[in-house]
Amino acid sequence: MMSASRLAGTLIPAMAFLSCVRPESWEPCVEVVPNITYQCMELNFYKIPDNLPFSTKNLDLSFNPLRHLGSYSFFSFPELQVLDLSRCEIQTIEDGAYQSLSHLSTLILTGNPIQSLALGAFSGLSSLQKLVAVETNLASLENFPIGHLKTLKELNVAHNLIQSFKLPEYFSNLTNLEHLDLSSNKIQSIYCTDLRVLHQMPLLNLSLDLSLNPMNFIQPGAFKEIRLHKLTLRNNFDSLNVMKTCIQGLAGLEVHRLVLGEFRNEGNLEKFDKSALEGLCNLTIEEFRLAYLDYYLDDIIDLFNCLTNVSSFSLVSVTIKSVKDFSYNFGWQHLELVNCKFGQFPTLKLKSLKRLTFTSNKGGNAFSEVDLPSLEFLDLSRNGLSFKGCCSQSDFGTTSLKYLDLSFNGVITMSSNFLGLEQLEHLDFQHSNLKQMSEFSVFLSLRNLIYLDISHTHTRVAFNGIFNGLSSLEVLKMAGNSFQENFLPDIFTELRNLTFLDLSQCQLEQLSPTAFNSLSSLQVLNMSHNNFFSLDTFPYKCLNSLQVLDYSLNHIMTSKKQELQHFPSSLAFLNLTQNDFACTCEHQSFLQWIKDQRQLLVEVERMECATPSDKQGMPVLSLNITCQMNKTIIGVSVLSVLVVSVVAVLVYKFYFHLMLLAGCIKYGRGENIYDAFVIYSSQDEDWVRNELVKNLEEGVPPFQLCLHYRDFIPGVAIAANIIHEGFHKSRKVIVVVSQHFIQSRWCIFEYEIAQTWQFLSSRAGIIFIVLQKVEKTLLRRQVELYRLLSRNTYLEWEDSVLGRHIFWRRLRKALLDGKSWNPEGTVGTGCNWQEATSI
């Protein structure tokens, strides 16, 4: 066994090493946005990590045992904008702890048991806009050192131990403050002196939340001549009398929005009546909301006598036993009744009302006509209402309506095509039960409608003119309905401005090839949750703006006729997930198309085979099908490839010979311009010019020669000139053989073409002139030329008087063969397939 001394000698250095390793190196922070946002929550850090980039802007250090923040704790993060230090067990914050964070806009200190807060704790935060100090053991605003934070807009000190509502003098420096949350503190009384700073330096945009404070007294005049944007008092009063007294203490307050009431399941009041709100007559209120009063209110109209002139009135979760009527005496422009309990649908006669929100209410299932001549916005959703007849101007008492939401209601019988409601722009019927939708053109009058939702309305489309009149419609949602014979006909012919169309869950199996032809502006099309068995791309060829096409959750096995070329080029996202792909050889081209289009397909990795059974559940991308083809097909295919290859090689090799053949066929009976086409090396051009041309063209009879330096057409390929200007327009060919000729590729090329020319035209002749002795070893390299010179008569140039005489006599005789000559000129005989020419 290891001795105790040796064990200690091993453990002590190991423990020393481990103590030096920082925990932040063991548990790295999560990089949410590279170099910008890092989440270091619950990593057991006891100090600020220094292994993050200087460019970090958003840092979450919540739930780490930091306990103490010293000066310049965040010196390494000069670009920081959002810092979350929630529940870090921080007890002490020293002077300059946030120094250097000049860009920080949000600081969250929630849930820290702060015991020592230095006067300069928040120094350096020159851009701070939001400070959250919830549950920080704060006992007073007086000692909270934030008076220098002139950019502060939101201060949240809820759930603390603050007992006095007195706003310190430094609030006069917080000129940008818009929201002060003092909810869930210990404030019981408000005195005039508490709000002195608001008299001296009014904060006109300030929203003040005093909810969940045990209020029992507000000194009359405390809020006199004070202007607030919003005041919230919920769950503040334990009795009706206290509530009445405190509301009277608000006399003289001018507030844009006042919120009174309680929270769900947290009510303190035992009863509530109209006297509670009598003090509101002494306030100037623009918008009023009363929330969560679970009491049966008998005379609701009398309850709000002091609120007749507010512009917006809202009741949320209030139980109302009876309502006489909302009459013309109220000057409200916006009325909101949400989640309330009514005995019956209220009678509404409000001349100035522009917006009515009546949603999620209970009781009064039958809709009764209203008289709202100025109404522009009407939300009657989620009430279970039934409409015996809909919809026209007489139902709502207005011709100004632009927004109508009747979703999540009961049976709605369509008996009118919106006469008098031609200004409608938004119409929502989703999850209501529509009757008589396919009996006539319901929407014929709605030429200004932009948004229409008839999803899950039990509509069965059997009339092609159902959407006639909707010429301005941009969004159409009709999911969860059905079509006659599960076939989509041409019902969108007038919807030329449509950009969004939802046809999901409509049990569709087929669609007309021209169903979408008029939708050139369509960008999003949802065809998911239907019963299509193949992907037919033809109907989408006219959708030039389409970007998103969803065909998920159908029964697609393959593409129709394996044709996929009709998808518009604008398409960016195609969803084919959760379909019944057939992974067989028969559909191999479609499966390969899926692999090729993986950039276009959404969640392509989720596309799996459904058949055959041995490949069920296998991702299409990982599929590798080996298809056995018929041996005959393989043989024919291979033979075809070989034949095509051989033909291509022969055409390539004998291209110019074929060109010559084509020329002979074309010019076969034409007239020759030249007596001979001269083939020679450019090195022998002096002899050709001084001897050959001079003696033949200036002699008697004269002969016309074709020479490349003189007679070839500029700008035409050399090979084309040789064939068209040389061979096709000449009776004979003169070949000037020399060592230079043998070594020239162009000369050999011309000679080979000349052989083909002689073969094709039986009247043609080749005259060989050996200009100088040629080495036999060099001549043997050109086998055909060597063989011809060995078997045929040729002319040999001799530079002597007798040799010249014999040379020119023999050459003229060869050229005269087949030539008609008279003193007036020279005329060729033309192509003659019966004549033969020889030397």
Curated annotation (Swiss-Prot):
Biological source species: Pan paniscus (Pygmy chimpanzee)
Membrane side Extracellular: residue ranges: 24-631
Glycosylated residues, chain numbering: 35, 173, 205, 282, 309, 497, 526, 575, 624, 630
TIR domain: residues covered: 672-815
Name the record gives this protein: Toll-like receptor 4
Membrane topology: Single-pass type I membrane protein
Renumbered ranges of LRR repeats: 55-76, 79-100, 103-124, 127-148, 151-172, 176-199, 205-225, 227-247, 331-351, 352-373, 374-394, 400-422, 423-444, 448-456, 472-495, 497-518, 521-542, 545-565
Keyword Ubl conjugation: yes
Gene Ontology terms, MF aspect: lipopolysaccharide binding; lipopolysaccharide immune receptor activity; NAD+ nucleosidase activity, cyclic ADP-ribose generating; transmembrane signaling receptor activity
